[in-house]
Amino acid sequence: VVHNYQYGTLHRYIDERLNKGINVICDIDVQGFKLIQKTDIDHISIFIIPPSIKELEKRLLKRGLDSENVIGTRVENAKEELKCAEEFDYRVLNDNFEQAYEEIVSIIINGKLTKNNDKINIKILRDMLS
């Protein structure tokens, strides 16, 4: 349950695809990540970092999908989730869409992000949390 909504992907669904040699991409939160960590599923984890908390709030408002109360809850949850970002294999800053997209594709295809980019993303993350 996230933001009072229930989300999930059936383990069976993932297993069926993996057994057929099909890679599965899941858009999950930190709770989902921690559940996958407890399984034997071979995975790569990518944490998408917002440019700032203010920018995240601005983007949520611009979407126009949630009330201000829900947005406030989402922002507070994001602050907590950011504390877990360094547990993920990679961190990608979602400041420039095209660049973030290229980094994610590189991680998926090559299984790596340049160490320099990841160090920069970790610094941005730590600055945001301080």
Q: Model-derived features: where do they sit?
A:
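Ras-like small GTPase catalytic G-domain
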Residues: H43, I53-E55, L61-K83, E98-Q99
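Conserved phosphate-donor/acceptor-positioning beta-strand/loop module used by diverse small-molecule
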Residues: V24-D29, K38-R63, N94
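NTP-dependent small-molecule kinase module
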Residues: K62-D66, K83-S130
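Helical mechanochemical/support elements of P-loop NTPase systems and associated helical scaffolds
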Residues: Q6-L10, D29-G32, S52, L56, ...
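ATP-dependent small-molecule kinase phosphotransfer cores
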Residues: V1-V24, V30-K34
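Alpha-helical elements of Rossmann-like donor-binding domains used by nucleotide-donor carbohydrate transfer enzymes
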Residues: Y13, N77, E103-I107
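Conserved catalytic network of the ASCE P-loop NTPase/AAA+ motor domain
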Residues: E16-N19, K38-I41, K83-A85
